[in-house]
UniProtKB/Swiss-Prot annotation:
Originating species: Salinibacter ruber (strain DSM 13855 / M31)
GO CC terms in record: cytoplasm
Name by which UniProt lists this protein: Leucyl/phenylalanyl-tRNA--protein transferase
The UniProt record lists the keyword Cytoplasm: yes
Gene: aat
GO terms under biological process: protein catabolic process
Lineage: Bacteria, Pseudomonadati, Rhodothermota, Rhodothermia, Rhodothermales
């Protein structure tokens, strides 16, 4: 693929199951299409018991698209990272166009953790997550999955599998099988973030029973106080 990294190129790449990663040393962006490909079946998401208890206690306030820049910069803030300045720039542009999204966990007004990814029709491509308070990124993932299911998404791509992700139900399929799942997802027109925070945290109630819609929160709004 060409080296000119633009939002339009990214959208086309994701629609074909391809994603970029930057080289921390050279800044070069390389394109990836793993085989096998990892994804999280939304109807088989497993929440460990201890995490389920934390979500129910609502230790964090959870929002979407309220602090995208802070989330992606926090995800990049580690000793070695593929989230280079070029990656940050183009994903920020994607966010401004409504394709890249962040999920934030707040505690007493401070950003405690979160994740970001790309939403394209009925597919969500998870990119990275971080935490400053224990379990904050996991709580963000729980809320993301609840919201995706409620909104009608059909595919949550995790790109690669890790032992950590497998605890939540992540599995792998051959690349051709993933591409078929992606094709079906691209025929879906879902709603982004339809549930209120309390509804997403109510793990005892199926998401299908909620009908109230919460507005999508954009990155220029102020963080909550707790």
């Amino acid at each position: 693929m060409p080296d000119d990294l633009t939002p339009d190129l990214l959208i086309r790449a994701y629609a074909n199951g391809v994603f970029p990663m930057g080289d921390d040393d050279t800044g070069i962006v390389r394109w990836h299409a793993p085989d096998p490909r990892a994804y999280l079946p939304l109807d088989a998401f497993h929440i460990p018991h201890n995490l389920r208890r934390r979500v129910r206690r609502r230790e964090f306030s959870v929002t979407a698209d309220r602090a995208f820049a802070s989330v992606i910069e926090a995800c990049a803030d580690r000793a070695r990272t593929w989230i280079t300045p070029r990656i940050i720039r183009v994903y920020t542009e994607l966010h401004e166009r409504g394709y890249a999204h962040s999920v934030e966990c707040w505690q007493e007004g401070d950003l405690a953790g979160g994740l970001y990814g790309v939403g394209l029709k009925g597919a969500f491509f998870g990119e990275s997550m971080f935490y400053r308070v224990s379990n904050a990124s996991k709580v963000a993932l729980v809320h993301l999955v609840r919201q995706l299911r409620a909104g009608g998404f059909t595919l949550l791509d995790t790109q690669y599998s890790t032992e950590h992700l497998e605890r939540f139900g992540v599995t792998t399929v051959p690349r051709p099988a993933f591409e078929q799942k992606l094709i079906r997802a691209l025929d879906v027109s879902p709603d982004w973030w339809p549930l209120a925070d309390a509804e997403a945290a109510d793990l005892d109630t199926p998401v299908s029973e909620f009908s109230a819609a919460a507005p999508t929160l954009r990155g220029n709004e102020s963080p909550p106080n707790g």
